[in-house]
Amino acid sequence: MYKNKAKSGTNNISGNNIARIRKEMYPKVSQRFLADKMQLEGIELDKNAIQRIESGARFVTDIELKAFAKVLDVSYEDLLAEQTL
């Protein structure tokens, strides 16, 4: 069965960006804190789901992407930008 993958082979494009943005925030934001903020937006994610998203092991829905953009105070473009080396 074919599964859609990002060029990097991960299940999402936004995971690396979510991790980078979260780690750049001041004060630093933990995965647990981010999960709590997402729950306040009505998105039921726990710390483990955040970890799987950031590592690219889990898909991200458009509803979740919208909430991530709001919680992290960034644009959709910031979350979907593909990193080039």
What does each of the following model-derived ranges do?
Residues N16, R32, N48, D62-K66:
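Short alpha-helical elements of helix-turn-helix
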Residues P27-R52:
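Short alpha-helical DNA-recognition segment
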Residues Y2-G9, K70, D78-L85:
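Short, charged recognition helix plus adjacent turn
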Residues N17, I21, F33, K37-E41, ...:
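Generic non-transmembrane alpha-helical segments
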Residues E54, E64, Q83:
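DNA major-groove recognition helix of helix-turn-helix
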Residues M1-P27:
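A short, Lys/Arg-rich alpha-helix, primarily the initiator
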Residues K37, T61-D78:
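DNA major-groove recognition helix of helix-turn-helix/homeodomain DNA-binding modules
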